[in-house]
Amino acid sequence: MKRRELETALRTAGRVARETEFFLIGSQAVHAYCRRPPAEVLLSQECDLYPMNRPEIANLLDARLGRGSRFARRHGFYVDVVTPEIASLPTGWQSRLKPLRVGRTTAWCLEVHDLIVSKLAVGRLKDLEFVGALFQRRLANLKTVRHHIRQCSRHRDRARLRSRLQSVLDELG
């Protein structure tokens, strides 16, 4: 998703929901950190968004802007309404959110290292490729990612995250 497409999604979500603040927890959060994100970000057709102050409007957003909606058919991208609980995130992630302002709407974006931990937790090939692209573009610091992994609550999760991180690093050579 290109930045202008993300901006369209955010403006429309704000208008539909009459909400000014959202969590942006997926790969599109990278737009808050760089003007020219990795190609893996541009390929995505969705932004993972959650209404920050009014979770009860999630169903409305999904119906109006979600996959298969008129908005999605018209624009070729959609809003995937999620909850922050679906992401495996290290302790303190809320204090590291970065704002991305579009008009009156603010998307609070995951900090890039928290985003990497979340993507490692999901572990799909596209997520691991995304993580690799962030390292290749020098948008992330390995030491910080390792620190964030140690901040995850369950030992079993930390071991899985370390293993997936090592796989990404091995692929990068």
Label every PLM stretch briefly.
Residues 1-173:
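Compositionally biased terminal segments of proteins
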